Amino acid sequence: MSCGGSCNCGSCGCGGGCGKMYPDLAEKITTTTTTATTVLGVAPEKGHFEVMVGKAAESGEAAHGCSCGSSCKCNPCNC
């Protein structure tokens, strides 16, 4: 990382790991206690609609990250 842990690209402010959309929330997220509930059972097979919605979600902002490139710029700038 060539920019000392922070770089900015539009609304994307990359901090600590240079891949987080909102680096200031990282501390709040890591200190929050969460519990998980696992439900075991049988579910119907995914239909065409659910598959398409899942693919659309994967191609959105959540699927793209920023990494710190040269001159303190996010690379790629697609977050």
UniProtKB/Swiss-Prot annotation:
Domain of life where this protein originates: Eukaryota
InterPro entries the UniProt entry points to: Metalthion_15p
GO MF terms, alphabetically ordered: metal ion binding
Tissue: Expressed in roots.
Keywords: Metal-binding, Metal-thiolate cluster
Keyword Metal-binding: yes
Role: Metallothioneins have a high content of cysteine residues that bind various heavy metals.
Protein family per UniProt: Belongs to the metallothionein superfamily. Type 15 family.
Protein name, entry field: Metallothionein-like protein 4B
Organism listed in the record: Oryza sativa subsp. japonica
Source taxonomy: Eukaryota, Viridiplantae, Streptophyta, Embryophyta, Tracheophyta
Encoding gene per record: MT4B
